Amino acid sequence: RRQRQMCIRDRKKRNLRIAVAKDEAFCFLYEDNLDYLRQSGCELTYFSPLKDSILPENIDGLLLYGGYPELHAEELSENISMREDIAGRIQSGLPCIAECGGFLYLHEYLETLDKEKYPMAGIIRGTGYNAGKLQRFGYMSVKAVKNTMLADKNQSFRAHEFPVSYTHLRA
């Protein structure tokens, strides 16, 4: 498996092209984060996990932000070509940052509040759930355990958390 270890602050090689999920299911984006990526020289290209059949071509990274995938679980599940493309590219080494709804989408299954279970991208072995209420709220400190697109190894930074979901992993 090929590993890509590029930091967005490293502009010596080339600009990075980042695919950003944006549609009715993935609509909770932080514009400040997107502005930071653009100011760092990244080209952002948007796609819809609901409507597009595959990811954009020639991308160096993938952002799956939050939203309401549980409200669109059936449609997301039916878009098999997109689910398979995302899974295949991540398994081939495409860096991906997924949060909240995007994290749920990467599971094998997503269970809705109505207890309906739908297949998703299958990167994370288990089922993601929307709890229907806030689990925690506040700020946290994060320390990178390896070089990533956003931080160097051992770099610490602050992050905001307000999860409304949880996961049951399987062995």
How would you label these PLM feature ranges?
Residues 21, 47, 62-66, 99-100, ...:
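Generic beta-strand/beta-sheet core signal
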Residues 22-24, 127, 165:
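Residue-level signal for short, function-critical loop segments
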